[in-house]
Regions:
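Catalytic donor nucleotide-activated moiety binding site of glycosyltransferases and closely related
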Residues: 126-133, 164-167, 208, 215-253, ...
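Conserved donor-binding/catalytic core segment of Leloir-type glycosyltransferases
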Residues: 197-210
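A donor-sugar binding/catalytic signature common to diverse glycosyltransferases
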Residues: 260-300
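Donor nucleotide-activated moiety binding/catalytic core segment of transferases
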Residues: 175-183, 187, 235-238, 242-268
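A short beta-strand/loop micro-motif in the catalytic core of glycosyltransferases
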Residues: 153-160, 268
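Aromatic- and Gly/Pro-rich donor/ligand-binding loops
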Residues: 1-148, 195
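Leloir-type glycosyltransferase catalytic cores
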Residues: 244, 248, 303-349
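A conserved, positively charged/aromatic
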Residues: 147-151, 261
């Protein structure tokens, strides 16, 4: 959704964005082995042809094909550099979700644009880039290289407030905070662009990246406070479906997930983007935050809107019909959206 929203925002500015398609095949052999073991241990048939993965992600793949402009698959550094040479661009933008997290991005140099020759006159921009964890996991021996690469950027913005001093103190680079790209679009734009169905429900929508008994219990408590039921939507539950049925593991369409938040009475989620879309769609929510790492993205977003009480432990508040001032939140978001859009427009000039 970040790629989709950023492309839409850039199109509104008159640009023709293309997202570089860097397949997961470029992961290390260890990561590929771990993925095969995960699928095997959860009884999902796995084969090297990627048939299983394509089946599970078929709706996501359809969404990408229909809504996101991609480059050809770039399966090596050689292909990436050749594409760069053959397809001149005004600017390259990196962002947003955990693009600078070493554990998730083995070819991390690419995300600092090492493949762009130093003397080339192309605008290098970071939009809402994220380290993913605090403290960051970039190896100390990479500091000098990334400091040099970052100082070739014309503008740097980050998704977490905590990343601003990290960039300054460790890499000598100036940065500012901006909204996650999903929040560059409004509620009405998502409905119109994606044809979402507006059909309000009395249910609590529980969107969990990882499903646990504790999280389901919290969703149940929230639902009981609302005198209603909850509906669980969990990618992890699909990935770990038992019984050997590949069809049971197919992830629902992206639009179904968005409509779940859009039409819910309120939302319980452990996902940053579950919170983001709750705010975009004006829905009360409870955020379940993992305090063992990666919570800075939640903290930045929730504090910007003054909604600290919406973190886990305050679920009883959702029984109030005036959980937060929707108009005030919309005004705050509109201001940050304008500031974030201005950052992009200025950086691209």
């Amino acid at each position: 959704m970040q790629a989709y929203a950023l492309q839409q925002a850039l199109r509104k500015m008159g640009y023709e964005p293309v997202t570089l398609d860097i397949p997961f095949d470029r992961r290390s052999p260890l990561r590929r082995w771990a993925k095969s073991r995960l699928l095997a241990l959860t009884h999902i048939p796995y084969d090297q042809s990627k048939r299983s993965e394509r089946t599970v992600l078929q709706h996501t793949a359809r969404f990408v094909e229909q809504h996101i402009t991609l480059s050809p698959p770039l399966r090596s550094d050689t292909e990436l550099r050749e594409y760069y040479r053959q397809q001149p661009a005004h600017a390259y933008i990196v962002g947003s979700d955990q693009v600078w997290r070493q554990a998730f991005v083995p070819m991390l140099d690419d995300y600092f644009f090492r493949f762009i020759p130093e003397t080339d006159d192309v605008r290098r921009i970071a939009y809402a880039a994220s380290f993913g964890v605090d403290p960051i996991d970039i190896a100390p021996e990479r500091t000098a290289l990334y400091s040099d690469l970052l100082n070739r950027f014309v503008a740097i913005s980050v998704r977490e407030h905590s990343a601003v001093p990290i960039l300054e103190q460790r890499f000598g680079a100036s940065a500012r905070w901006v909204l996650d790209p999903t929040m560059l679009l409004t509620r009405d734009e998502y409905i119109d662009l994606l044809g979402l169905q507006v059909e309000p429900s009395s249910e609590v929508f529980a969107y969990m990246l990882t499903d646990t008994p504790h999280k389901e219990e919290l969703a149940q408590q929230v639902a009981e406070a609302q005198h209603t039921t909850y509906r669980l939507f969990s990618p992890w539950r699909h990935w770990t479906a038992r019984g050997g049925s590949l069809e049971a593991c197919i992830l629902p369409p992206v639009e179904a997930w968005l409509e779940g938040i859009l039409n819910a009475r309120c939302v319980v989620t452990d996902s940053f983007h579950g919170v983001a879309f709750s705010l975009i769609f004006g829905k009360p929510f409870v955020a379940i935050v993992n305090n063992r790492g990666g919570c800075s993205r939640f903290d930045s977003l929730i504090k910007v809107f003054g909604l600290e009480s919406h973190q886990e432990g305050a679920y009883e508040l959702v029984s109030s019909p005036q959980l937060y001032d929707v108009k005030a939140i919309a005004q705050t978001m509109a201001q940050h959206r304008a500031d974030s859009t201005d950052f992009l427009q200025t950086a691209l000039k």
